[in-house]
Amino acid sequence: VQPDLVTMENVPQLLDHPVFEEFLANLEGYAIQWSVVQAVAIGIPQTRKRLVLLASKLGDSGLGLPTDTVKRKTVRDVIGRLRPIAAGEADPKDRLHAAPRLSATNLQRIQHSTPGGTWRDWPEELQAACHKKSSGATYPSVYGRMSWDAASPTITTQCFGYGNGRFGHPEQDRAISLREAAILQTFPPTYK
């Protein structure tokens, strides 16, 4: 198959893998452009980085790759006006704006977390045993709370769980809702 246009996006670490060079070699005859794109630089309120490739048999696509030309959006910019909800509560007008329940221990943990912070903010009695290991495998990015005035971390499929990353709401003592996660990924607020 020799399509006129080829697009690809992937993790930036692909650049360090031999398969990327093989992929480029298979695009002989194409005009190729590729770059690592910072999501926040193109209006997506996440710190996510992606390798983006455009290849064209029609010559230079003229599309160019995005550059830092837009106002950077923050968590506050995109979810700051949503109705406040508590852990285990849902917005009666929006079934996707629902926060999972937290255990009593995790509620205490998030109450001790600062915006932009992690489990390292907690008193020692709230720290999990795995965080106290001297092996270095302490998962510093789990149990984090987002910061209002920064981009969110990369939103993953596990973002609804407080212990799965830096997915604590910046101010409310809960994990982010599916609605908030969707908006942070640039889905419209009315998306069903």
Language model region names:
Residues 1-142:
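Class I S-adenosyl-L-methionine
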Residues 98-192:
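C-terminal target-recognition/interaction regions appended to catalytic cores
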